Amino acid sequence: MGFEITDGTGTGNSVRVSPKKRMLVEAITTNSISSSSQDGGNAFSVGTEGIVGATLADGAESALFYAKNNDDRNLIVDVCVVSQEQAGYYKFYRNPTSGTLIDNGITSGAAQSFNFGSSSVATLDTRIANATSQTFTDGTVITYSRNPAGVQPLDFLSAVVIPKGSSFGISFTPDGATASDVSVFFFVHYPEEK
C-alpha cells in the first residue's frame, strides 16, 4: 500500500521520488550562528581580546579565559579559535568556579554581536588572564587539544551547551619555557525561540 506526501497548502504539489527510491527535495540550510545572528543578533564573539592574550614564560598550565552564563537561555559554544606562538595543549573546563583567574583576572569586554545593527548583548561574566600561571582550582576537564604554533579552530567545542549558572574555561600549557603570546576567541550564540 502506497501513500502520497503533498504540500498541505492546496497547490496539489507532491513529493517526487527518484528511480533509486530517494525523495527529491529543495532545501535551504543555514548554520546556527548565521541564523541566530540574522534573526535577533544573538550570535557573539567573546575572548581574550586583542592580539596578545597572555604571555606565558614558565612552561606551566595557565588559565586564559572564563565565562559564566547568566542568561535564562542556554548559551551554545559553537567554535573556539586559538592562536599561540609555540606548540602546546589546551584544556577545556566544565563549570570551574574558583582559581586565580576567576578571583583576580581582568573582566573581559562585552561580547560583540555578529549582527552589526543589533543592540543584543550576551549576559556573561567573563575573566581573562592578566598574569602567567593563572589557575582553575576546580571544574572538570572535558577535553584536550594539542596544537602547533599558529592559528587554529578547535572544532571539538561544537554544540557545547552552557545553561544558566554554568560556566566554562580554557587553559594553555606551552611546550617549553620560552615566552609565548596566546589569544583565544569563542563564537557563541543563544538559540532563537521556536
Where are these regions (language model features)?
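Internal, hydrophobic beta-strand segments that form the core of beta-sheet-rich folds
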Residues: I162-G176
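Beta-sandwich interaction modules
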Residues: T140-S166
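Extended, low-complexity segments enriched in Ser/Thr/Gly and acidic residues that occur primarily
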Residues: M1-G117, T123-S133, D138-T143, F172-S183, ...
